[in-house]
């Protein structure tokens, strides 16, 4: 394993951590509707649980309503039930073969709770990034110990890993700030 492999590997892992954090943020409900909120809803499709996106089209009707159109008529009741039981605080309403999912307005107290959740998720993501930095630095130290690289190379590589860490932590901070602003916007 070379220095380049170590740096490339840690950067890929950090990016995956950022992507996982983004998907976690997408699940946190804001006052506005977006189809990504329903991505993790699982529907019973003839005995097996599948994501809602595999049995229905989802569209935005307006800023506060998601329209869900199951591809098969018999699935309407099952999709509605799955949305209701997904613990998102949503109350879908069916009209024919179309399901409308209105977003209830968030209270000020709930908004504050959600910003705390966002900050907590952000801290968890930062810890994951820092753990990746630690692992990379340990791998570099092992390369020095095995006499595969010099201490100067290790120091330069450690600085590069630190720069990657700083870049990804700053990206997490930016994502947290934008999500908080989105939540607090009435």
Swiss-Prot record:
A GO molecular-function descriptor: ribosomal large subunit binding
InterPro entries: Ribosome_recyc_fac, Ribosome_recyc_fac_dom, RRF_sf
KW Cytoplasm (keyword) present: yes
Biological processes annotated in GO: cytoplasmic translational termination
CDD domains: RRF
Organism: Burkholderia lata (strain ATCC 17760 / DSM 23089 / LMG 22485 / NCIMB 9086 / R18194 / 383)
UniProt subcellular location: Cytoplasm
The protein's name: Ribosome-recycling factor
Chief location category: cytoplasm
Function recorded in the entry: Responsible for the release of ribosomes from messenger RNA at the termination of protein biosynthesis. May increase the efficiency of translation by recycling ribosomes from one round of translation to another.
Domain of life, source organism: Bacteria
Cellular component GO terms, alphabetical: cytosol
Record's keyword annotation contains Protein biosynthesis: yes
Pfam families named in the record: RRF (PF01765)
Keywords: Cytoplasm, Protein biosynthesis
Family: Belongs to the RRF family.
């Amino acid at each position: 394993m070379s220095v380049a492999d170590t740096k490339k590997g840690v950067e890929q892992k950090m990016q995956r951590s950022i992507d996982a954090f983004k998907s976690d943020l997408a699940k946190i409900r804001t006052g506005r509707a977006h189809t990504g909120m329903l991505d993790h809803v699982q529907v019973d499709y003839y005995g097996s649980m599948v994501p809602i996106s595999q049995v229905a089209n989802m569209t935005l009707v307006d800023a506060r309503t998601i329209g869900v159109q199951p591809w098969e008529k018999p699935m309407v009741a099952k999709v509605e039930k799955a949305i209701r039981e997904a613990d998102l605080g949503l109350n879908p309403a069916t009209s024919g073969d179309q399901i409308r999912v209105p977003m209830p307005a968030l209270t000020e107290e709930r908004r504050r709770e959600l910003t705390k959740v966002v900050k907590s998720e952000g801290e968890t993501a930062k810890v994951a990034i820092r753990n990746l930095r630690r692992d990379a630095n340990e791998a570099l130290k092992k390369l020095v110990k095995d006499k595969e690289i010099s201490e100067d190379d290790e120091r330069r590589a450690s600085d590069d890993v630190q720069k990657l860490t700083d870049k990804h932590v700053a990206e997490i901070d930016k994502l947290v700030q934008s999500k908080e602003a989105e939540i607090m916007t009435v």
